[in-house]
């Protein structure tokens, strides 16, 4: 089984990269996010690999980090999510954004990925909410917000407040941190408008 490829980029396609490793070229299917990060033809590349072996085919999937590869596998543990849909999710959301969305039970965020309908989005945020922290990577904001909310799922006002702050130009992590601080400082039980106001106050400090 192939776990990692180190070589040079021979070709980049719409959904794959051809990697030359000492004269042997490997096709690795990747998310759009990965393809945007690996560089140009002729440059050196290192990819973490997930190998799929079927009766009639062998496919390699490439990732820029081991964390992204773990998310690829975790996503496919949910019914209705195969390799193609998992790559679409990782093309749309970074691992930290994905961890945030699951911690916040943000189905709308998940549904931005092609191939993810409402039912699959619900299954993703429900089935992965207890697994996501282990795969959060640098998504400390989502973990902090989840701790403020306790073991329950994020309320609609919380998700709306985070979404509103990101629409104002703040990063997902900044928004989640601000809402977590707002909840801690007296915003618990408030509506989205109150959380947005308190969140903006936190961000202005």
Swiss-Prot record:
Self-association and partners: Homotetramer. Forms an RuvA(8)-RuvB(12)-Holliday junction (HJ) complex. HJ DNA is sandwiched between 2 RuvA tetramers; dsDNA enters through RuvA and exits via RuvB. An RuvB hexamer assembles on each DNA strand where it exits the tetramer. Each RuvB hexamer is contacted by two RuvA subunits (via domain III) on 2 adjacent RuvB subunits; this complex drives branch migration. In the full resolvosome a probable DNA-RuvA(4)-RuvB(12)-RuvC(2) complex forms which resolves the HJ.
Comment text on domains: Has three domains with a flexible linker between the domains II and III and assumes an 'L' shape. Domain III is highly mobile and contacts RuvB.
GO cellular component, one term: cytoplasm
Region of interest (Flexible linker), residue spans: 144-153
Region of interest (Domain III), residue spans: 153-205
GO biological process entries: DNA recombination; DNA repair
Region described as Domain I: 1-64
Region (Domain II): 65-143
Protein name: Holliday junction branch migration complex subunit RuvA
SUPFAM superfamilies: DNA helicase RuvA subunit, C-terminal domain, Nucleic acid-binding proteins, RuvA domain 2-like
Highest taxon above the source species: Bacteria
Organism: Agrobacterium fabrum (strain C58 / ATCC 33970)
Family: Belongs to the RuvA family.
Biological role stated in the UniProt entry: The RuvA-RuvB-RuvC complex processes Holliday junction (HJ) DNA during genetic recombination and DNA repair, while the RuvA-RuvB complex plays an important role in the rescue of blocked DNA replication forks via replication fork reversal (RFR). RuvA specifically binds to HJ cruciform DNA, conferring on it an open structure. The RuvB hexamer acts as an ATP-dependent pump, pulling dsDNA into and through the RuvAB complex. HJ branch migration allows RuvC to scan DNA until it finds its consensus sequence, where it cleaves and resolves the cruciform DNA.
GO molecular function terms listed in the Swiss-Prot or TrEMBL record: ATP binding; four-way junction DNA binding; four-way junction helicase activity
Keyword annotations of the record: Cytoplasm, DNA damage, DNA recombination, DNA repair, DNA-binding
Record localization: Cytoplasm
InterPro entries: DNA_helicase_Holl-junc_RuvA_I, NA-bd_OB-fold, RuvA, RuvA_2-like, RuvA_C, RuvA_C_sf
HAMAP family cross-referenced by the UniProt entry: DNA_HJ_migration_RuvA
